[in-house]
A protein has these predicted regions:
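Extracellular/periplasmic carbohydrate-active domains that bind, remodel
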Residues: 1-430
């Protein structure tokens, strides 16, 4: 049945697509089909239970560039970190499939292009950021995202909040690497999530596990598997944190390739939550330096727990515990790195606020080739966001440890191109 979408790339088809979704869901479910060779410009769309949103080859669903139509915050009362475009809450049996494209129209929401990033447009209200997140999926039970291409997000791209039993398979997520906050996939307070066979390019983190304070009712982030993915990021390709007010536990990340990234693998715990029982295995990565706009100093492996930098009145109730403007950091423990091959301008970094915060970190069969490839100055490790000084200036070590216990290394090999890395300090600083 045709619900009146034009597909001309000019008319806003959100109302027509919404009618199709509502009618399909009301009848118990089915497929909402976007045909080939058409571009469907659309504002916000509310997805429903028992729907397969199917994008045929050559079809494009594109975000309307009119900032004024995005009314729903992606983070509840916190309106300072973007709005929702394609969204849903507390539904079940949702799938997004096909070989068509979901286009976030990201450049339309940017300011001037700089050499390393885009400026953000000046905000009329500093507490309100109108940039739309592409997919904000809240409390979905049984979710599938398969085969689609998602391009040019203006803010976070795929955000799973409190989802259970989710599969993301075979997608290409291709963001502009100059767009700040352009996360790829954020797994937030979610359980039983499998991400596989994906190609992800993003300015911010490609895949990020976290527990945001706004969504604490959904509990811990647990039982996550990432396999067979290829990633490029100007921040961190695979990250846990920095937001973590609960626990992140039982995570397996295996058989991945990371190219032309800033950080490769990162645990960046900055809140009171804990990170335990995580295994990274069979990963090859290439990390190098970018400008200070991006967190990270080319650390191929980064395991940290530090208190977040003190906030202000805007941070109370969402960045820190209710009513507070500062927080504390939780424990990071039982983290294993197996069979990692890295080429990088910097060494690995392991550190905590106190020695008990980071413990039982295992490096098994890790090979690191230190090689200078950019003109950015090295010899710095990046602790941001944290209280106090965010950078540690040091010689470059294969593994630099600051305030941690139980760090074990078995078959760690560090090869240094000494002419290009004259400040090489050795395999470790221990």
């Amino acid at each position: 049945m045709d619900y009146g979408a034009k597909g001309d790339g000019i008319t806003d088809d959100a109302a027509a697509i919404q009618r199709a979704i509502d009618a399909c869901s009301a009848k118990g479910g089915g497929q909402v089909y976007l045909p080939c060779a058409k571009t469907f410009l659309a504002g916000p769309i509310d997805l429903k239970s028992n729907i397969d949103l199917h994008l045929d080859a050559g079809s494009v669903l594109k975000a309307n560039p009119d900032e004024s139509i995005y009314k729903l915050s992606a983070f509840k009362e916190n309106r300072g970190e973007g709005m929702m475009w394609l969204h849903c809450k507390d539904i079940e049996n949702l799938s997004i499939t096909g070989t068509g494209t979901i286009h976030g129209n990201g450049i339309a929401f940017m300011g001037a292009e700089l050499f390393d990033s885009y400026e953000l447009k000046p905000l009329k209200d500093p507490t309100f950021d109108p940039r739309p997140h592409v997919l904000t999926l809240i409390g979905v039970k049984r979710l599938v995202i398969r085969d689609v291409t998602i391009r040019e997000g203006a803010y976070w791209t795929v955000h799973l909040i409190g989802c259970q039993d989710a599969v993301i398979d075979g997608i290409s997520l291709l963001n502009n690497v100059k767009i700040r906050n352009g996360d790829g996939i954020d797994v937030d307070h979610s359980k039983n999530v499998r991400i596989s066979n994906c190609h992800i390019t993003s300015g911010d983190d490609c895949i990020c596990l976290k527990n945001r304070r706004e969504w604490e009712e959904y509990g811990a982030c647990t039982d996550i598997v990432v396999t067979n993915c290829v990633m490029t990021s100007r921040s961190c390709a695979i990250k846990i944190g920095s937001e973590n007010m609960d626990s992140i536990v039982r995570v397996m990340i295996d058989n991945c390739v990371i190219t032309a990234s800033n950080r490769g693998i990162g645990i960046q715990n900055r809140d009171e939550g804990t990170v335990t029982d995580v295994v990274f295995s069979n990963i090859t990565l290439d990390s190098h330096l970018f400008s200070d706009v991006w967190w990270g100093k080319a650390e191929p492996i980064y395991v940290t727990s530090y208190p977040r930098a003190n906030g202000n009145h805007k941070d109370a109730n969402w960045r820190f515990p209710k009513g507070q403007i500062e927080g504390r950091c939780g424990e990071v423990s039982r983290i294993t790195f197996n069979n990692i091959v890295a080429t990088s301008e910097n060494g690995c970094f392991v550190g905590g606020d106190t020695r008990d915060k980071v413990n039982h970190i295992y490096f098994n069969n890790v090979r690191l080739h230190l090689k200078k490839v950019t003109d950015y100055r090295g010899g710095v490790y990046d602790k941001r966001p944290c209280k106090g000084e965010g950078f540690i200036k040091s010689d470059v070590f294969g593994v630099y440890v600051e305030e941690a216990t139980g760090v074990q290394m078995h078959h760690l090999e560090v090869v240094c191109d000494k002419p290009s890395v004259p400040n090489f300090g050795g395999d470790t600083n221990l």
